[in-house]
Swiss-Prot record:
Belongs to the protein kinase superfamily. CAMK Ser/Thr protein kinase family. PKD subfamily. The gene is dkf-1. A zinc finger (Phorbol-ester/DAG-type) spans 98-148, 186-236. PANTHER family: PROTEIN KINASE C, MU (PTHR22968), SERINE_THREONINE-PROTEIN KINASE DKF-1 (PTHR22968:SF15). Its main location: cytoplasm. This is Serine/threonine-protein kinase dkf-1. Changing F197G: Increase in sensitivity to phorbol ester or DAG stimulation of kinase activity. Loss of sensitivity to phorbol ester or DAG stimulation of kinase activity. The active site is at D551. Changing T588E: High basal kinase activity, loss of phorbol ester-stimulated kinase activity. Highly expressed in embryos and at lower levels through the four larval stages in adults. Present in a region bounded by the anterior and posterior bulbs of the pharynx and an area of the tail containing the lumbar, dorsorectal and pre-anal ganglia. Expressed in neurons. One of its GO terms (biological process) is defense response to Gram-positive bacterium. It comes from Caenorhabditis elegans. Changing P109G: Loss of sensitivity to phorbol ester or DAG stimulation of kinase activity. Loss of sensitivity to phorbol ester or DAG stimulation of kinase activity.
Length: 722
């Protein structure tokens, strides 16, 4: 996008959506408009992976039409306010190979390889495929998702060449590939009682019991044990007519709302995170457990999802069978990888190459060192089962050792990096978010198995003047001296030559995620008040310590449980926090503009009162699901326009006291802005129901009360046992 977009009003825009990512893009009419939108969409997608093997298309949402998505083929189809969905389709589609079947009579109990149910009857209970030897019900052999897995079977067609084709669509407007091939959609599993003998799709064992023997996918009908559900591949395909027409008007649709306010969405962070192509290693490996050296096993090893997966089956051209997993070794359970320089455990076998030691005291002995085998060369393994050149034991040893290390550079202080790696296993493909200078990953504490959050800060992001490094150290210093139930806890810090690792407690989501997950895109007053009091109590603690957060927003309010309407909250991300004594002001650039008061945006002096403005914006976006201000007008003018600030929808459903509190917080004059104490004493944040909700949380947490007081017990006439 060129610089001219900086002055474009939000009134002329489109929204690009990809999964959970949503970005508002100004719309400028010219010949290259569609190309520019496609380029921006490509940049969004590339932040999540590589596009080399997939085609990208834009589809327009039409909520009032039986066809919910329409492909964009020309710029004339795009109107202001349109919501454009980014769709990816694999360039090489898997060939659809039908089964070649004939009736079969079975002399022993046999189960359908498609649905898992027993083939019943006296004669000709089912059909058998000549190519793959699969056994099916007659009705299952022709099912749309039942594709013959035999390589070279009749009917196989060559893959489409990897070039950009025109969009192949059905009469409903969807890409053919998107409808005919699995897309990694997760299953929706529910308990099910089976009237016929049925086997598990993962382990092929019978689902036993009288009722509720297993789980059945609501959409595609696959059956699994409860214990096998985690191993079920995410390859669900919705059955026909599973998606029905929406019978309501989506508030995001063009022209569906009379309000000009900007819908709430996740604002881009200060640090752009882009997924990098991770090198992979896979191949057949010989291994055994040290306690059982006689049992030599060969499995197809694959490193994925921060764990080593050991598969029973692998076929060239098809790959591994995801349903045949022998064992999964999480990296977080590996304590060390040690090269073996000793003798063989058993004299009749060659010595193993290296050992993988785990927290469960299991030692995996991997590979066979024929060079160290004394007493003559061993019997050679058949060529078809030998270790592939790209997956020899030396490469696996180095790869696992590197995977156990935190994301770092070679010139890092090795001693510090080793100390950190011994304590924590960073799950580098599990990104939680990003802050001012670093990326936050999920990690596992090795000795306890506890999941934590690790912020990995690259010192390359800091300016040469060192202000960035000082800011980072100031953030850590603030976290080290704070101790409050409403503030995220710092557990550990480690600094190397090139990186800083900050370990904090991990929560399960943030306030913005909770708001956007609601059906109406906003919270009700009861939940809002419950969360707000927690935020204010934590903020009061910070202000009493002389600390201003300076970047308060829903993204920086973490929640303990996304499944609860009344979770505990904790404030995080102190990258912009400042020590501001009483009667002093600062002028440094801080925070996220959408939540900052005018004095910060205009580079005037600000004090801790800027956090109270942010609280007002948080209340507004939580109750309405929109931002309070547009960029096209002065904030002071918008505040004077009550009909603009508080349109009938949805503010007619909100108590007038809530509107009064927002107006007293969103004061342009710093002196007129409400303080924390005044805010907590406001009538909207009083009431027996709110008191009960807060007291219940304190009892659940089993901590000293910090949200209510004994005076509240007397005031509301309810004494709750501490």
């Amino acid at each position: 996008m060129d610089g001219s977009q900086g002055s474009t009003d939000y009134g002329d825009h489109v929204v690009l959506r990809y999964g959970g990512t949503r970005e508002m893009v100004p719309l400028i009419r010219h010949e290259q408009m569609l190309d520019m939108l496609m380029e921006r969409a490509r940049q969004i997608v590339q932040g999540f992976g590589n596009l080399d093997t997939r085609n990208m298309y834009l589809f327009r949402h039409e909520y009032n039409s039986p066809t919910l998505l329409y492909p964009i083929t020309s710029a004339s189809q795009i109107t202001s306010g349109s919501i454009l969905e980014i769709i990816l389709v694999d360039r090489t589609e898997a060939a659809v190979i039908p089964h070649v079947v004939e009736p079969e009579s079975y002399m022993r109990p046999t189960f359908c390889d498609f649905c898992g149910e027993m083939l019943t009857g006296l004669m000709r209970q089912g059909v058998k495929c000549k190519n793959c030897n699969g056994n099916f019900h007659k009705r299952c052999s022709n099912a749309a998702r039942n594709n013959c897995g035999a390589p070279g079977a009749p009917g196989a067609q060559p893959s489409r060449p990897p070039i950009l084709p025109p969009i192949p669509t059905t009469p409903t407007g969807f890409p053919v590939a998107a409808l005919s091939t699995p897309t990694g959609l997760p299953h929706t599993l529910i308990e099910h009682s089976y009237r016929q003998f049925t086997v598990c799709k993962v382990c092929d064992h019978l689902l036993v019991g009288l009722v509720k023997q297993g789980l059945k996918c609501r959409d595609c009908g696959v059956n699994v044990h409860r214990k096998c559900a985690m191993e079920l591949a995410s390859n669900c395909v919705l059955s026909e007519n599973a998606i029905s027409r929406v019978n309501f008007t989506d508030p995001e649709g063009p022209g569906s709302s009379s309000s000009d306010n900007i819908p709430l969405f996740r604002l881009p962070g200060q640090v752009g995170t882009r997924a990098t192509e991770k090198k992979k290693l896979e191949g057949w490996m010989m291994h055994f457990i040290l306690s059982d050296p006689e049992r030599r096993l060969k499995h197809y090893w694959m490193m994925q999802s921060n764990a080593i997966h050991l598969y029973n089956e692998y076929s060239e051209g098809i790959g591994v069978n995801p349903n045949r997993v022998y064992r999964i070794i999480p990296l977080a359970e590996i304590t060390s990888v040690v090269q073996n320089n000793g003798k063989s455990v058993l004299a009749k076998h060659p010595p193993h190459c290296f050992e993988i030691r785990t927290t469960t005291n299991t030692v995996f002995c991997v590979g066979e060192d024929y060079h160290a085998f004394s007493g003559g060369p061993p019997k050679k393994i058949p060529r078809s089962m030998s270790v592939r050149p790209s997956s020899n034991t030396t490469m696996w040893f180095q790869f696992i050792k590197e995977s156990l290390q935190p994301p770092s550079r070679n010139e890092d202080n090795a001693e510090q990096a080793l100390e950190f790696a011994n304590l924590y296993q960073v799950l580098s493909d599990k990104t939680l978010g990003s802050g001012q200078f670093g990326t936050v990953y999920s990690a596992i504490q090795r000795h306890s198995g506890k999941e934590v959050a690790v912020k990995v800060i690259s010192k390359e992001r800091f300016s040469k003047k060192g202000s960035g490094a000082e800011s980072m150290r100031a953030e850590v210093a603030i976290l080290q001296q704070t101790c409050h139930p409403g503030i995220v806890c710092l557990e550990f810090m480690c600094e190397t030559k090139d990186k800083i690792f900050v370990v904090m407690e991990k929560m399960n989501g943030d306030m913005l995620e909770m708001i956007l997950s609601q059906e109406l895109g906003r919270l009700n007053s009861r939940a809002t008040k419950f969360l707000l009091v927690q935020i204010l109590c934590a903020l009061k603690y910070l202000h009493d310590q002389g600390i201003a957060h300076c970047d308060l927003k829903p993204e920086n309010v973490l929640l303990s449980d996304m499944g609860s309407n009344f979770p505990q909250t904790k404030i995080c991300d102190f990258g912009y926090a400042r020590f501001i004594p009483e009667s002093q002001f600062r002028k440094t650039v801080v925070g996220t503009p959408a939540y900052l008061p005018p004095e910060v945006l205009q580079r005037k002096g600000y004090n801790k009162s800027l956090d109270m403005w942010s609280v007002g914006v948080i209340i507004y976006v939580t109750l309405s699901g929109t931002f309070p201000f547009n960029e096209g007008e002065e904030i002071s003018e918008q505040i004077q326009n009550a009909s603009f600030m508080f349109p009938t929808e949805p503010w007619s459903e909100v108590e007038p006291l809530a509107v009064d509190l927002i107006q007293k917080l969103l004061k342009v004059e710093i002196e007129a802005r409400m303080s924390i104490e005044q805010c907590l004493d406001h009538g909207w944040l009083k009431g027996e129901q709110l008191y009960r909700d807060l007291r219940d949380l304190e009892v659940r947490l089993n901590t000293p009360r910090y949200l209510t007081s004994p005076q509240d017990d007397i005031l509301y006439g309810t004494l709750v046992n501490p």
